[in-house]
Structure formats: C-alpha cells, structure tokens
Amino acid sequence: MELRTVTSPDEVRIEDDPVRKGVEYHFRMTNGRRIFTIPDKAVVCTANTFQLPTTMNELERYSDSNAEEFTIFYTVWSYEKGYGRLILNYVLPLLNTKRYVTLSPKTEMAVRFHTRNGAKMISDNEESYNFEYYK
C-alpha cells in the first residue's frame, strides 16, 4: 500500500469529500495545507497551524507552512472500510508538529470514528469538535 503526498489535482477526487464539499483544491494545497492519499482507498487533508482552529474560517487564518505547533486533520474519507484509519496511521509518523488534532463536524459518525481510532475529544465547539491523536 503506497501513501502519496498529492501534488496535482489529477491525483485526488476532492468532489468525493463527504464533509468539506465546498473546499477547493487550491485551498487544500496552500499556506501549510496538504493532501495525502492512498490511491483509490483514502484521502486526508491536513493543515499546519500555530493555533487550534474551531471553524474553517479560523483554519484558513491560522494555516502557515512554518507552523510547528499543530497539524490539523480537517477532513478524511475512504472508499473502503478501514482505510480512513489506515491513512491516519500512515500519515502520523511523517508529521513533525507538536500536536495532532482534528477539526471535525459535529456528527456522531465523527465521534465514533475518532474515538474508535484512539483520539481523545479535547474541545466541543459551537460548530465543530476537536479530537487529539497521539503518536
């Protein structure tokens, strides 16, 4: 199984993102934001930030390629059961920030996914949840 860092829009179908449908490819690839994929299996979008965002607007403001405090997982999806968890397990060892936190929608599915995969809820916000993963 090969993990890739996306460098071209042809490598990922962002229209398949069930959570962040309106987020353009350019946004996902600028200011410290990246996309990782296990081709045809799973995708995760990350952002490096100096502060913990609780909204997508804050994520946009706080994203910075020089940030070393947080890696934010703001969307993850898979095409087959189990690959969402697998891509997180592949990506975490590659990251070099102090903390690994999600910006998750307020859904039961997000709670189940992240808690089953070892994350701890650290913040219940007006528009989102933040779960923290540990290496």
Task: Describe these PLM feature segments.
Residues 1-27:
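Short amphipathic alpha-helix that is part of the acyltransferase structural core
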Residues 24-42, 48-52:
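A short helix-loop-beta-strand connector motif used in the catalytic cores of GNAT acetyltransferases and
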Residues 33, 68, 96-97:
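Short, high-confidence coil segments that cap the C-terminus of an alpha-helix
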Residues 78-94, 116:
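Conserved acetyl-CoA-binding loop-helix of GNAT-fold acetyltransferases
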Residues 95-106:
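Conserved GNAT acetyl-CoA-binding A-motif
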Residues 105-128:
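Conserved active-site alpha-helix within GNAT-family acetyltransferase domains
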